[in-house]
Amino acid sequence: MSFEFIRKLPTPDEIKEQFPLSSQLQELKKNRDEEIKKVFTGENNKFLVIVGPCSADNEDAVCEYVSRLAKVNEKVKDKLILIPRIYTNKPRTTGEGYKGIVHQPDPEKGTDFLQGLIAMRKMQLHAMDVSGLTAADEMLYPENWGYVSDILSYVAIGARSVEDQQHRLVVSGFDVPAGMKNPTSGDLSVMLNSVYAAQQSHPFIYRGWEVKTEGNPLAHTILRGAVNKHGNSLPNYHYEDLNLLLEKYHERDLVNPACIVDANHNNSGKKFEQQIRIVKEIMHSRKLSNDIHGLVKGVMIESYLEEGCQKIGEHIYGKSITDSCLGWNDTEALLYYLADCE
């Protein structure tokens, strides 16, 4: 057997007991979850903006970012619901590179999963406390969900995970919205199959237990662009793409049809500055069609304190060490633009 069992890690309950959620933050999450849920059920017309760094690598910078976001939120909260993007696990195309704070709490040092789980929990709690906002993260590892299940208000399933059965089954047990991204091929049927699976009840094995879920009616789609056989980006945020998704939804027995559009990744061709133009086009499409207006519940934007990206070890505070992001000034202006659109 080629596995080396290095050490047993604390269970989610043990980590939660060590770093508990205060009663005040529990109430905050309850209220935020209810408000966000109503967007997906059609009871709330506010527009969702999931915004933040490509990867949350530094607690101080992330907490400064969400503190700034909280100040903007006070001015736009009648029109928008801002959800900080605090991504603590990063899928890597080749398996190499920085995989997030859970793997490496210090990007310049080796893997330390024990300290990584603690760092993830502490950062999410700190960000929630200083901003009054509950966050979004990507569920890269389904078995790790329990470490943050009482903190997150939104979860994304990535393009490389969306076809995986365990991801779909675990999402079916969530009580928060879960966005299922289209795969890198762009196949909408794969994404919609994933949504369908997540909305159903399932029995399965999870963390050594036989479990059964009730299904998640808040599972929905995320359009993030695709890649063709030549490796070129194919965007899927245009009016005709949104119309096609709407038609595909109508062909299926799915509840709460909804879409979030990811303005970066293959929609922008990884040209981060294009996110501003893309978001504006999405808002224009919503104005042109009541059906698209009802389908597109929000956007996802990669943004940090400083624009662009840097190599690990350059130590530029608030600048991404993974994909390039919008800087704060452009982000703030874009958020006010979105509020004016609503």
Features from the language model and the residues they span:
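Acidic (Asp/Glu)-rich catalytic clusters
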Residues: F40-E43, A70-K77, L125-V130, T213, ...
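Short acidic, Gly/Ser-rich segments with clustered Asp/Glu that frequently serve as metal-coordination loops
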Residues: C54-D57, N256, N264-K270
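Internal helix-turn-beta structural module
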Residues: Y304-E342
